[in-house]
From Swiss-Prot:
It is found in: Endoplasmic reticulum membrane; Sarcoplasmic reticulum membrane. The modification N-acetylmethionine is found at M1. This is Sarcoplasmic/endoplasmic reticulum calcium ATPase 3. It comes from Mus musculus. It is a multi-pass membrane protein. Inhibited by sarcolipin (SLN), phospholamban (PLN) and myoregulin (MRLN). Enhanced by DWORF; DWORF increases activity by displacing sarcolipin (SLN), phospholamban (PLN) and myoregulin (MRLN).
Length: 999
């Protein structure tokens, strides 16, 4: 029932054909249950295991590998002799890679969808209802509540369904709905209709929402929505509908896969077509079909060479290592790809309450009257330090610390704060923090009393548990609270009736202490306390006090102000009608104004510096909150999101103002705005959508249930460690210390990780280019195979994989947070860089082919054939005069492939050392800056020697040990790559960067 807040309580009851006294009949309950279903959030039907497995093979790179494996399997069946065993190694290795990749992917997916289930923790297990089958209130399972049920709630209860209030059974009803709306203080509710069809949840003061908590009071309501129809249920539906966005890296790798598949197709077809004339060569027994299959195998080898099989594993490893480094900085990453996405974050949309602020109300200013003579009024103003519930802070007047006990007015102010209060401070020993017990506003007053210490209580030697209420307990020993006149909306105040516990000249007779909204309390004041004496409250003094309060409540502070007053001679309690709350205002008259306190949910002290740092890094910070616009803008000014005098027109919007804009205006508003106030969950998701339409990479922070859909929709969802389980499981990242500063550290780490990823991706790709050039050259020139597929797989996965992973440990650039965010569409390799890595790759390919050719032509242990004979080796037969005296089996020797493989591995190790920096010379940034890289190079070379020397590996990889002279040739062909890359780096530094600057 969407419009329940618009109707009177009687109209809502009529709609459901129910009375508040009798409740629903059993027939009505049965009908409603059939119509609306159970009052619970349905269990999410996740994807089946089979669906998840199939999904892992939708990636283009994976499909290319799968095709290569299937073709290799088919070809392996036709192998004969010694090659039969080794032929199956290649497809088996590829399949093992794909299976491992799928297992990791399925495991991640299984964990990712837990957010929806976490919402269930906000569903209360039991509820209290009135039904016609039994007298009075009965407890039933919350899932059995149906629309139309009369539900009773009291302090401490979790609201079991969305309720329209019909009767408040206490003087006031306050509800903590911060998990749903993000409001930092509990909200006073009433039963009146709200004639505003566009009211947001924060303005629906006659509604109680499922999953929120009753802070004080007792009430009856009629259930108007259950299950998925509740506001909590709508959030669940939004979360279920959100499709996870692919990260910039995933999109780039998809694009890379598409380009690679096209390139592979062209090259493979070209190699096969070029060699059609050789299909019937004697080496194939004159069979055209056998020749076609032979060259098809070479085309498959090309495909294997072109695919960087090790890339998925190396990227996963690098991101996993990055998450460990981030965890040490209090940023726990749940989704691996989001580590890289952090590096291109351009907008951080931050929830205010508990993220930019502490979510711990704190009194930061107070005043008492110093002078109130005819025509003049002077105030004693004080500031109080401390931004949490920790009872430590300093009271200052101007710049000077003061002893509060020296001011009679402050002693009385502290007395009112301590006694006119139903809340307390508590030290949570498990968490090691001070927490509120009761109302946030009243807890702030309790904390203020502890900081003021007006009776100079000796606090040394107290445990933290004892310290939580030491100063308050001293005041409570002097006066005893007899009863409380609860807060009500009409008088906007509450009061306590207190009597002295013992005869004391300072305390004479019973008193009433009052606190409430300044305008309402001051209106009922006839005098003002000046020190220890009482003076009449003149019009001048009244205006002066109200002007100061208005000043605090607006401008850069927007403090929540409370006036504190005393009734020195209250009526006798026997003469007071305490069961009639309409008379309370009569008892709270003829008051003496004592002072005023100003409080706020204070900004975290470290946030302002972080926002400045974000600004320097080209990242826009946008505050999104459920609080009112004035408070939100004031906090923005304190944090530096807005300047002190900056005009916020077009930069700050309420949810309603945002709704009033056309879709295009909403898009433009999201492009410029830095503050959104009074928003609902749907607004947050729309803001993220609009930002994404401008290709902004959005990080959304939050801690409440209301943040979860937007956290899931944003590229980076960041939840607070103290936040709700729903927010945490919808997010990609959780801040264990709830500190906005940790986001900035995580962004810096993300940028460093991306830079390192660029290095190892380019490193791996230059290796693949070299392998493709090698196979393409041997095919075009008609030379024997220099590298076979199983060797290529070994290099791509193992030998190159270790240094590539170690490149993830490269140190970050010093100016990494002084640059704007990189464009998420920026290509991994483009322009000059593409030429650089193509040049390196071509050299790798030429050197590899040259090494194999050298053994045939020049090695004293080789056949020393001519280059012409080598190019026509397929025509070799006993009766061919061109090959007289040459054993044709020499063209199947393992030595040339071993030479080629050794050169490829050695060059790749040199390349890895070159990759410590993209443009800096090895003389400026030597390899030992990354000791992990040196270890990886040593390990890779050790593994290479392993396959050369340890049986049965030489048989599997078709290699053989080399002599010292042969190793000398390998080094001569490999080391020049360092000089080539140094020359290309020199050109980059001195010419290419200058061109960029000119652009």
């Amino acid at each position: 029932m969407e419009e329940a807040h618009l109707l009177s309580a009687a109209d809502v009851l009529r709609r459901f054909s129910v009375t508040a006294e009798g409740g629903l009949s059993l027939e009505q309950v049965t009908d409603a249950r059939e119509r609306y279903g159970p009052n619970e959030l349905p269990t999410e039907e996740g994807k089946s295991l089979w669906e998840l497995v199939v999904e892992q093979f939708e990636d283009l790179l994976v499909r290319i590998l799968l095709l290569a494996a299937l073709v290799s399997f088919v070809l392996a069946w036709f192998e004969e002799g010694e090659e039969t065993t080794t032929a199956f190694v290649e497809p088996l290795v590829i399949m093992l890679i794909l299976v491992a990749n799928a297992i990791v992917g399925v495991w991640q997916e299984r964990n990712a969808e837990s957010a929806i289930e976490a919402l269930k923790e906000y569903e209360p297990e039991m509820g209290k209802v009135i039904r016609s089958d039994r007298k009075g209130v009965q407890r039933i399972r919350a899932r059995d509540i149906v629309p139309g049920d009369i539900v009773e709630v009291a302090v401490g209860d979790k609201v079991p369904a969305d309720l329209r209030l019909i009767e408040i059974k206490s003087t006031t009803l306050r509800v903590d709905q911060s998990i749903l709306t993000g409001e930092s203080v509990s909200v006073t509710k009433h039963t009146d209709a709200i004639p505003d069809p566009r009211a947001v949840n924060q303005d629906k003061k006659n509604m109680l929402f499922s999953g929120t908590n009753i802070a004080s009071g007792k009430a009856l309501g009629v259930a108007v929505a259950t299950g998925l129809q509740t506001e909590l249920g709508k959030i669940r539906s939004q979360m279920a509908a959100v499709e996870p966005e692919r990260t910039p890296l995933q999109r780039k790798l998809d694009e890379f896969g598409r380009q690679l598949s096209h390139a592979i197709s062209v090259i493979c077809v070209a190699v096969w077509v070029i060699n059609i004339g050789h299909f019937a060569d004697p080496a194939h027994g004159g069979s055209w079909l056998r020749g076609a299959v032979y060259y098809f195998k070479i085309a498959v080898a090309l495909a294997v060479a072109a695919i960087p099989e090790g890339l998925p594993a190396v990227i996963t490893t690098c991101l996993a290592l990055g998450t460990r480094r981030m965890a040490r900085k209090n940023a726990i990453v749940r989704s691996l790809p989001s580590v890289e996405t952090l590096g291109c974050t351009s907008v951080i949309c931050s929830d205010k309450t508990g993220t930019l602020t502490t979510n711990q109300m704190s009194v930061c200013r107070m005043f008492v009257v110093a002078e109130a003579e005819a025509g003049t009024c002077r105030l004693h103003e004080f500031t109080i330090s401390g931004t949490t519930y920790t009872p430590e802070g300093e009271v200052r007047q101007g710049e000077q610390p003061v002893r509060c006990g020296q001011f009679d007015g402050l002693v009385e102010l502290a007395t009112i704060c301590a006694l006119c209060n139903d809340s307390a401070l508590d030290y949570n020993e498990a968490k090691g923090v001070y927490e509120k017990v009761g109302e946030a506003t009243e807890t702030a007053l309790t904390c203020l009393v502890e900081k003021m210490n007006v009776f100079d209580t000796d606090l040394k030697g107290l445990s933290r548990v004892e310290r939580a209420g030491a100063c308050n307990s001293v005041i409570k020993q002097l006066m005893r609270k007899e009863f409380t006149l609860e807060f009500s909306r009409d008088r906007k105040s509450m009061s306590v009736y207190c009597t002295p516990t013992r005869a004391d000249p300072k305390v004479q007779g019973s008193k009433m202490f009052v606190k409430g909204a300044p305008e309402s309390v001051i209106e009922r004041c006839s005098s003002v306390r000046v020190g220890s004496r009482t003076a009449p409250l003149s019009t001048t003094s009244r205006e002066h006090i109200l002007a100061k309060i208005r000043d605090w409540g607006s401008g850069s502070d927007t403090l929540r102000c409370l006036a504190l007053a005393t009734r020195d001679t209250p009526p006798r309690k026997e003469d007071m009608h305490l069961d009639d709350c309409s008379r309370f205002v009569q008892y709270e008259t003829d008051l003496t104004f004592v002072g005023c306190v100003g409080m706020l949910d204070p900004p975290r002290p470290e946030v302002a510096a972080c926002i400045t740092r974000c600004s320097r890094a080209g990242i826009r910070v946008v505050m999104i909150t459920g609080d009112n616009k004035g408070t939100a803008v004031a906090i923005c000014r304190r944090l530096g999101i807005f300047g002190d005098t900056e005009d916020v027109l077009g930069k700050a919007y309420t949810g309603r103002e945002f709704d009033d804009l056309s879709p295009e205006q909403q898009r433009q508003a999201c492009r410029t705005a830095r503050c959104f106030a009074r928003v609902e969950p749907a607004h947050k998701s729309r803001i993220v959508e609009n930002l994404q339409s401008f290709n902004e990479i959005t990080a959304m922070t939050g801690d409440g249930v209301n943040d979860a859909p937007a956290l899931k929709k944003a590229e980076i969802g960041i939840a607070m460690g103290s936040g709700t389980a729903v927010a945490k499981s919808a997010a990609e990242m959780v801040l264990s210390d709830d500190n906005f500063a940790s986001i900035v550290a995580a962004v810096e780490e993300g940028r460093a990780i991306y830079n390192n990823m660029k290095q190892f991706i380019r490193y791996l790709i230059s290796s693949n280019v070299g392998e493709v050039v090698c196979i393409f050259l041997t095919a075009i020139l008609g030379l024997p195979e220099a590298l076979i597929p199983v060797q290529l797989l070994w290099v791509n996965l193992v030998t190159d994989g270790l240094p590539a992973t170690a490149l993830g440990f490269n140190p970050p650039d010093l100016d990494i947070m002084e640059k704007p965010p990189r464009n998420p569409r920026e290509a991994l390799i483009s322009g000059w860089l593409f030429f650089r890595y193509l040049a390196i790759g071509v050299y790798v390919g030429l050197a590899t082919v040259a090494a194999a050719t050298w053994w045939f032509l020049y090695d004293t242990e080789g056949p020393q054939v001519t280059f012409y004979q080598l190019r026509n080796f397929l025509k070799c037969s006993e009766d061919n005069p061109l090959f007289a005296g040459i054993d044709c089996k020499v063209f199947e020797s393992r030595f040339p492939t071993t030479m080629a493989l050794s050169v490829l591995v050695t060059i790749e190790m040199c390349n890895a050392l070159n990759s410590v920096s993209e443009n800096q010379s090895l003389l400026r940034m030597p390899p030992w800056l990354n000791p992990w890289l040196l270890g990886a190079v040593v390990m890779s070379m050790a593994l290479h020697f392993l396959i050369l020397l340890v049986p049965p590996l030489p048989l599997i990889f078709q290699v053989t040990p080399l002599s010292g002279r042969q190793w000398g040739v390998v080094l001569q062909m490999s080391l020049p790559v360092i000089l080539l890359d140094e020359a290309l780096k020199y050109l980059s530094r001195n010419h290419m960067d200058e061109k960029k600057d000119l652009k």
